[in-house]
Amino acid sequence: AIYVLFSDPWPKKRHHKNRIIQGRFLSDVARHAPAGVPLYFRTDHSGYFSAALEIVQAHPDWRVDPEAPWPFELPTVFQQRAESFQSIVALRR
């Protein structure tokens, strides 16, 4: 499994190119991940969540699974600080 938990959202538009969830990152990870491997993404930044969801949905190597359960619910330090958060679970095609 691949976990991307509360990575830097780079909120300024000119910095969006620095976000980890990009097409190239997803392609690089997919190259090393066999079919069926889950990618778990969680953020407390709604703008980053929306952008990441669009990128993952458009990527040919990943399929978003809205019904997939989150594998664990032990709160991270960032999760405890966040007012709310959103998650994506995607499976390698």
For each of these PLM feature ranges, what is it?
Residues H15-H16, Y40-R42:
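Short, glycine/charged-rich beta-strand-loop motifs at protein surfaces that mediate ligand recognition
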